[in-house]
Each structure stands twice: as C-alpha cells, then as structure tokens.
C-alpha cells in the first residue's frame, strides 16, 4: 500500500469521481487559483484537467456556496 498525504488521497478520490461521472464538479473558495501548485493540495491540477466548467471558484460567502450547491443539485449536477 502506498503512503499519501490527506490532500493527495482527496485529490485522487475527486479525480476518480470526476472521471466516472460527468455531473460531478468542484466549487469552493480558491479551488482553481493558480497559487495552488503544491501537489499535496486536494485540488491540485484539477482545473487544468477538467476546466473551469467543472472546477469553480466561489466568493467568500457560505450562503452563495450553499445556493450554488442546492441549485446545481436541483438541475441534476453533483457538487
């Protein structure tokens, strides 16, 4: 069994979920920002691989993030 950081394991899980299901997307504060070059970050490389349509930066607003998630799930997407 290989050893991974928590961020690497989460990145692998997100990658698998996004490969299997095209309705899965990631939204959050700073998830697509280019400053996240550290390979141990959970969202490292996902913006480049899946594009801005599936990796979305959100404002620093929990209400906005919750609204995005509820609206997306009502439309059949999986935030």
Tell what function each PLM region has.
Residues 1-79:
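Thiamine diphosphate
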